[in-house]
Amino acid sequence: MDDSDTLEFSDILASTMHDTKNSLGMLYNTLDTLIGQCQEKGCPVQQDHFLLQYELRRLNHNFIRMLSLYKAKKANFPISLDYHSVSDCLDEAIVVNEPLLTSKGIDIELQCPADLFWSFDKELIMGILDSMLNNAYLYTKDKLMVSARREDGYLVVQLEDNGPGYPDYFLMDSRRKSGSAGSHVSFLTGSTGLGLYFSVLVAKSHTRDGREGFIRTMNGGIYNGSVFCLHLP
């Protein structure tokens, strides 16, 4: 076998992750069906089913992030820009996660102008929103605000909760190369760090007139908890 017939280990690993991600998707859909049946019968282990659903989604998000990072390293990070209704996209992301969040008594509120449209890669942005909403299941107390607005030529999508807030080392502004607490985050350790790194990568891939998208994390907001901000030019 010559070198041209030899697959790199990273390619084999990426292919395996892709197959595993698809299997997780099938498991998630099956569990979703079981949850619906359990709900109709007043199943006493319904909350356990929701917890399993949360973990499956978390694993699936990690595989999606790793595959995206692999494609980025191969200089093949896919971007497909089109104009979308921001309100419809946010509502779609909430609907997908609402059963999981409401099972824990989390109240979700959406604030977005109906006439707000923007150009972005819907699949990638929905991946960020889905991941952040899924994380809220674990970190918020019982409130979550999802909002969007125009600000200084950017689309700003913001998620706020009434949880304990981000630890100091997790506060960041991805426009800064150094000198911020966020610069000390080890993105490759822990699912939360990987999720943030993926979000930064997706944001930066959206460019317009020499400007890049960026991510900010802070504490405060209307609930005095954590605030995640996605800025797209």
Predicted regions: what is each one?
Residues 143-153:
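Short beta-strand/loop element within the Bergerat-fold HATPase_c
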